[in-house]
Amino acid sequence: MPRLALTVVFTLLAAGPLQAAEPALPVFTDITEKAGIRFKHSIGDFKLSNIVEGTGAGVLVFDFDNDGWMDLYFVTGRWHPDVSDNYGRQLRGKLSNRLYRNNHDGTFTDVTERAGVGGHQFSCGASAADVNNDGFVDLYVLNYGPNELFLNNGDGTFTEISEKSGLADPRWSLQAVWFDYDGDGLLDVYVVNYLEYDKGVFRAYYAAQNYPGPLSYPGQPDALYRNNGNGTFTDVTKEAGVYNPEGRGMGVTVLDFDNDGLPDIYVTNDAMPNDLFHNTGGGKFKEEGLEREAAFGESGQGVSSMGPTFADVDHDGWLDLYIPDMDYGCLLMNRHDHFEDRTTATGLAVICGQYTGWGGIFLDYDNDGSADLFIANGNAHNEYPEDPVLVRNDGQGRFIDVAAQSGDYFRAKYVARGAAFADLDNDGDLDLIVINLNAAPKVLRNDGGNRNHWLAVRPMTVGGKRDALGARVTVAAGSMVQIMDNCPTRCYLSQGDPRLYFGLGQAKKADRVEVRWPDGTKTVLADVPANRLLTIVQPNK
């Protein structure tokens, strides 16, 4: 019987503490200018006047040059004849998406022109995955108009293959998530499409400071594309069972909500029921949102759901969901065969009810082992700024507002939209990147999160060429057991760090690290030292 080939790579990123009593709470420091980020988001016009402009944009975190440091890709709107007012025409040709390479010293360099990824459309979101299994992560940009797929050439440049690939969806796409839905070893993609915007619809019925909402326009169906393995993709939306012509999708994530080893899809829709597509095997899905009580929150009606995020909030071994919205937000706790709305019971409704939430992120910002929550807020219909939210999980079923203690960033208001998480400086704590509508983004360095111990895990497929999207990682340290599914697409219009970060608190090692691979096989490691990046490559069968 042949031996299993297992590759484990330990990378010591930063020295952790020897001992600490009760660590002070971390703060987030605005390093945007110091980091050399000169990007500014634009709605492609001078005045916010419609739902296309108001939807905003996200940000992508990915390591495009395989140097072990996370790079940033920012997307922007641009003047569009079907969207923008005539006086914004002077912006035509002056706006583009921007790619920033991480210089390893806290700064970034704009390499957009050399890379060839400025794009040509009104962009809303971006995602990344190694679509051809060549070891280099590729770039997919979601647009109002044809989407754009850029293949990574491995030399710092990209080649656009949008039309040839079959992924140049002409509809209004907001977000995409990559995963292997059929288990063939190739990454497929689910694309969220929003609505059919018409510049002239109902304009006379709205006050000057407002504009028509999502129900004023027909919805558009999302799309699931199967990777054919030859550089092309096939639309399998209907045959896979994920067709919803009136969803008005705003966000998507992939998680194994029922612990059966298969990737399920959760889609958030605007003013409509959310969709929970249960993977029943054989490349088929069944919509079970209402049946599992995940279609609505406790209000029992569709709200303006934005980007979903997930984590095992209560350490019961089942992944929970949070959905920012225009109401109180919605925390759906996984009760194994259904979900329960615990937004009010956990204290989140009181904290979040006064804001319009867009980019929600579960992250353990203080590395104590429990999932905390950041929410980027901003008015939906005008450029009225709102407070960002940061709440700390107390480990006892409540969330505590800690924004006032978390740095100067939280003392100001913003018209925020997308957001992403990343360990940009490889120091063991998660930083934040927040996109502001028609303004500069904020890059926020986490200072102090690594006072507690931590472990970062990056599961890779056989051969170590690409991230094992869909793998589940379990980390046990002392009495605490944490789980996380490998899906970095878990925030509004954005994609975060592909590495999975686990806070260990005062534990100096993980007693057990388990990777359940997408094919169901498992790799188990014991007594893993803390404060390092652990790259685990799936063994050959």
Regions inferred by a protein language model and the residue ranges of each:
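Gly/Ser/Thr/Pro-enriched helix-cap/hinge segments flanking short amphipathic alpha-helices
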Residues: 21-27, 45-46, 338, 346, ...
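Blade-edge beta-strand/turn elements of extracellular beta-propeller
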Residues: 28-31, 107-116, 157-167, 231-243, ...
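Hydrophobic beta-strand segments that make up the repeating blades of beta-propeller
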Residues: 69-76, 134-143, 189-193, 260, ...
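Beta-propeller blade signature
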Residues: 95-102, 220-227, 278, 388-394
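Beta-propeller blade termini
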Residues: 56-66, 101, 122-137, 148-151, ...
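Bacterial N-terminal signal peptides
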Residues: 5-16
